[in-house]
């Protein structure tokens, strides 16, 4: 079979509201995460310099802020932001019922 299929709702969150789909899809290079969160949800500050992979954050619904190397980028539904591997980032949701897809790969 040339594809794999998974529903994020069938994947146990590894952190509150975070559904990591890489294993469920059998993906070797691309990580995909769905985040469902309410106002005030904040992710941990991190970077991906060791893995040398960039990430794209796509906000589907709600409102969020992505702080990249100390600069805050406000996001509305439909906005996408790409972040360099070495950049430090922190994600914060600013509205209830927000949903985001994060994809990352080398």
Outline where the language-model segments fall.
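Active-site donor-binding loop signature of nucleotide-sugar glycosyltransferases
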Residues: 23, 39, 77, 85, ...
